[in-house]
Amino acid sequence: MVFAQHENIILIGMPGAGKSTLGVLLAKAIGYDFIDTDLLIQRQAGMTLGDYLHNHGYQALRQMEAEVIQGLNSASSVIATGGSAVYSDEAMHHLKASGCVVYLQCLLNVLDGRIASMNDRGIAAPSGQTLADVQAERIPLYEHFADLTVEISHQDSEQALASILQQLPL
């Protein structure tokens, strides 16, 4: 894969994997803009993801996420997606057409330690699903859409950033 100048870098992965944190660091390191789709959703909804999930349900949150992503028109940006972006083929094809999709792979026990409450975090999943259930359901989707997979489970932010930079065809 050859990375064209001005292409976006799209980060996908489970909630708690570090998409937003690493996205900011990556954008700064390569001189790109940073876009966090979770923040765009919150701005459009006028409430937190957790509140939106509570008031409208997980399917409405997934739909809004897909609409926000399909409305993106950016270049030279690092885009941190919500963990459920991969449920929308249309949204993911829109993202893939604009750049390189990087799956930030993280072990369940690491994610579990970072996420206090799935509901408060705004994780778009049916009631009763555990984080393990959500991860098992999403891994095949992340792997399907990823151009690159970077394992970051036992790395701090700087190490994870170095791993991403090493694997990106910049």
Regions found by a protein language model. Give the residues of each.
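ATP-dependent small-molecule kinase phosphotransfer cores
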Residues: 37-85, 89-93
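NTP-dependent small-molecule kinase module
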Residues: 1-5, 25, 29, 100, ...
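P-loop (Walker A) phosphate-binding loop of NTP-binding proteins
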Residues: 14
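Short glycine-rich anion-binding loops that position phosphate/pyrophosphate groups of nucleotides
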Residues: 83-86, 107-109, 155
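A glycine- and Lys/Arg-enriched "phosphate-lid" helix/loop adjacent to the NTP-binding pocket
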Residues: 97-140
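Hydrophobic anchor at the beta1->P-loop junction of P-loop NTPases
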Residues: 11
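Hydrophobic positions on the alpha1 helix immediately C-terminal to the Walker A/P-loop
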Residues: 22
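Conserved lysine of the Walker
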Residues: 19
